[in-house]
Amino acid sequence: MEIGQTLTVTNRKQWRSWLSKHHKIANDIWLVYYKKESGKRRIPYNHAVEEALCYGWIDSITKPWDEESWVQRYSPRRKKSHLSEMNKERVRRLIKAGKMTRSGLERIRHDMDERSPKKPKLKKFILPGDILQHLKSDPVVWKNFKNFPKTYQHIRVAWIDGSRNRPDFFVKRLRYFMKMTARNKKFGMVQ
């Protein structure tokens, strides 16, 4: 897939402004993310995904752009596509915060509980045994993990668990999560 129109934003307000004007007319946009070592400001990944969900858009493939940045494609969600568990957690929080737009809610309607149009269906969160064992193996990591917000715990564990079909990624993600949790730091995306 070729990289189309690009957009550089440094905060969620700028991204939300672009989405509010273009979410119904644009087919996609490639958001520019500067690498940390570039020293240039960029919107954090989690903020970008959350704002996209508010308008019924979703992130997809990433590609290198130049020596100091990469790009990620954002586009409207297909009508019958399903939300990942991570995005269900995000949407639940966005609904509670009153940030979801009508367009965003319409795009996820089929993933929502018919009994309550404002509450997405969510599977009960179960921490996989092997991940739990790793977290508990370090008392500092386990203490910090338990103090993180539940939504963050679910998103990060789903991110790790979702890479099981690629064991090298699973190990890399788990190690990175353990390292950051030991420092009591939350993160949005490994680069």
Model-based region annotation:
Residues 1-191:
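Charge-dense, helix-prone N-terminal extensions
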